């Protein structure tokens, strides 16, 4: 499906080498101040071509908003926007017209649809995530009204793990590293010099989230967040709170005890029973190494024959770097959606509006 969310929805369109990518945000309340400069600044964080640690494809990623905004305020109507593609090099992919790239969605898209756009992965390209970043920025404008913030940074690249968790540092880091930036850069450069790629772990936190968000049983907050993050290109695992470590804990260690001031620990990552507890929400997204590598590889062609091929084009050596910006956006979209869904949960909420 190409639409995300229940009450607040984002529908995206476009392909990597098409005319444009874009989206429609529906369900954003009327009367919200739309800060176009903020939205553009979020897109700039993800924009390619800004350093040697991302793809050389240099797109301006300037957003054009077509509808749903009047005098700088949301009208309650769908907000349509587009980001035009200007730096495609489709000829770089001509040798892939008859070939399925290992680690990519080429084979599976062809098996599902019987047709595929070989130019940069088409619809399956991470180019589409610019739309999610824009959508997440719109969602953050709503979250700002409730003083909710979402922060992400790169916790590790390859075997290098950050020596600290500093989101202020990450915002000023060229690779959004939470710490140990130079060692992480070295890991990326080493992989790239060997015509290879490297994976990453992204840490995200949401602060100021009120207790009560989540729609049990089948749209729990934790499952919605996990699905949103797993839907990002290259994410292969998501952890919440203490994550996989809880399987080796005793209950006495895992339980987050409480006193008058709140929780004494946060192994649950701010979510209990699929509902936000009021504690900080903590998530980790594990990104696989970029499948686009410049080594000769064995694969199949459209005829099902084994062939050797070597990739051309422009690609990120570590997708987790820009992926950290996308993770922030998806968490924002989920939280904004859950806020709107939760608004009618209690009768007293309806009475405040209509009583």
Curated annotation (Swiss-Prot):
SUPFAM superfamilies: Chorismate synthase, AroC (SSF103263). Its EC number is 4.2.3.5. InterPro entries: Chorismate_synth, Chorismate_synth_AroC_sf, Chorismate_synthase_CS. One of its GO terms (biological process) is aromatic amino acid family biosynthetic process. The keyword Manganese does not apply. Keywords: Amino-acid biosynthesis, Aromatic amino acid biosynthesis, FAD, Flavoprotein, FMN, Lyase, NADP. GO terms for molecular function: chorismate synthase activity; FMN binding. Gene3D superfamilies: Chorismate synthase AroC. Its cofactor is FMNH2. Pfam families: Chorismate_synt. It comes from the Bacteria. Reduced FMN (FMNH(2)). GO terms for cellular component: cytosol. FMN binds at residues 123-125, 233-234, 273, 288-292, 314. It catalyses: 5-O-(1-carboxyvinyl)-3-phosphoshikimate = chorismate + phosphate. Pathway: Metabolic intermediate biosynthesis; chorismate biosynthesis; chorismate from D-erythrose 4-phosphate and phosphoenolpyruvate: step 7/7. Signal peptide: none annotated. Belongs to the chorismate synthase family. Homotetramer. This reaction introduces a second double bond into the aromatic ring system. HAMAP family: Chorismate_synth. This is Chorismate synthase. It comes from Campylobacter concisus (strain 13826). The gene is aroC.
